[in-house]
Design a protein with these regions (language model features):
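Conserved beta-strand positions in repeat-built beta-propeller and related beta-rich domains
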Residues: 36-40, 82-86, 126-130, 171-175, ...
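Beta-rich, blade/repeat-based domains predominating
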Residues: 29, 61-77, 108-123, 151-168, ...
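Beta-propeller fold detector
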Residues: 54-62, 101-109, 143-153, 190-199, ...
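Aromatic- and glycine-enriched pocket-lining scaffold segments that form the walls
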Residues: 126-136, 144-186, 192-194
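An edge-strand/N-cap motif at the start of beta-rich repeat modules
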Residues: 26-53
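Structural signal for beta-propeller blades
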Residues: 42-45, 88-90, 132-134, 177-179, ...
């Protein structure tokens, strides 16, 4: 197993310039770009190829500082959104005509400090510490004015992640709420946030989620569980067994991968119907605590931090869900790298 280590210092990150609907549908797409953000002040979007070579380092023109979140970066049809927690806005980037180079398109103000973003129904959804809001997306960019907002049930700063399912949003608040918000026919947020039913009695820190169609898989991190939410109700809950605090999720066809922070690992589950079955307790291990995970076109990207440095690990995923480590990028002196997405070749062409 070959792993090439690329080391970047915190000071180098600041000066590096440009170098020489459901996301889980199966296709012939190939991975093109792997993205993460420094989450520093100022914040920077880092763009790599699947081999871990730095292609671009782009200022978001905002400030980072988010923690305890999931989905800090989102992508859809060549657009990429990045949360800037410290400056209460979201940077939106657009792929150029070659489908491989990003440029800043919009800086969208948020109602409060943003923690998570998602695309769907021609909208950008921004989850902040107290609310969720929708912004219309067009080829010209993202409307800076929200066309819908809803206050979270707790609105206590514990918001974790937002995801899009059929006709609504699913949201986590770490203060033990899994909630939904309805969308209009055009995709705008409408009405109030509602607590989903049948949440396990031992609920403790809902955090990350992954969505597909009408299903949302949600981690209940400190209860060591993963739940399936459908139609405003929890249908199934599965324990993570030997691995503790599953916090972040990524879907790959029949496989669901969880990043387990204190266990320094990724687990693999088989998911179908209402079933969540642990297939491999430990599919991969890391030097630090994982802080996010993403899948795209046969690649899995995982961010981790060991308290001194952050790392981006890029795995190949075979048809059986087995992970083979390809490259590891080390961010020397950068401890809070946040968010990861993988841009595929078909997304680059969907301009």
């Amino acid at each position: 197993m070959l792993a090439r280590i690329v080391t970047l210092s915190a000071s180098a990150l600041a000066i590096i310039g440009t170098a020489a609907n459901p996301a889980n549908a199966q296709s012939h797409a190939t991975p093109e770009l792997v993205l993460t953000a420094t989450n520093a002040s100022p914040n920077t979007l880092l763009v790599y190829d699947p081999s871990g070579n730095l292609l671009q380092s782009i200022a978001t023109h905002g400030h980072g500082g988010v923690s305890g979140n999931a989905g800090g970066i989102a992508k859809h049809r060549g657009q990429v959104a990045v949360v800037n927690f410290g400056s209460s806005d979201v940077s939106v980037f657009d792929l150029g005509t070659d489908g491989r180079r990003l440029h800043l398109q919009d800086l969208v103000p948020a109602v409060s400090n943003p923690v998570s973003v998602a695309f769907g129904y021609n909208h950008l959804y921004i989850l902040s510490t107290t609310s969720v809001e929708s912004h219309w997306v067009s080829p010209a960019g993202v409307d800076p004015q929200p066309d819908g907002t809803a206050t979270l049930l707790h609105a206590d700063g514990s918001a974790g992640q937002v995801g899009v399912v059929t006709g609504q949003l699913v949201i986590t608040e770490k203060s033990n709420a899994i909630e939904s918000v309805a969308l209009t026919a055009d995709g705008a947020v409408t009405g109030n946030a509602n607590l989903v039913s049948d949440i396990p009695a031992n609920v403790n820190t809902p955090l990350g989620l992954a969505t597909r169609g009408n299903d949302a898989y949600v981690t209940i991190a400190h209860a060591n569980e993963i739940s399936l939410v459908r139609d405003d109700a929890v249908l199934t809950t599965t324990p993570s067994v030997t691995q503790h605090a599953p916090c972040w999720l990524a879907l790959d066809g029949p496989f669901l991968f969880s990043a387990n922070s204190p266990s320094l690992s990724v687990s693999r589950y088989a998911v179908y119907g209402q079933h969540i079955i642990q297939d491999a307790a430990v599919a991969a291990t890391f030097e630090g605590d994982p802080t996010d995970i993403a899948y795209g076109a046969g690649r899995l990207g995982v961010i981790d931090s060991d308290g001194t440095n952050s790392h981006l690990s890029i795995f190949k995923v075979d048809e059986d869900g087995n992970l083979t480590l390809g490259d590891v990028v080390t961010f020397t002196g950068v401890v809070s790298t946040n968010g990861v997405v993988i841009i595929t070749s078909d997304e680059g062409l969907a301009r």
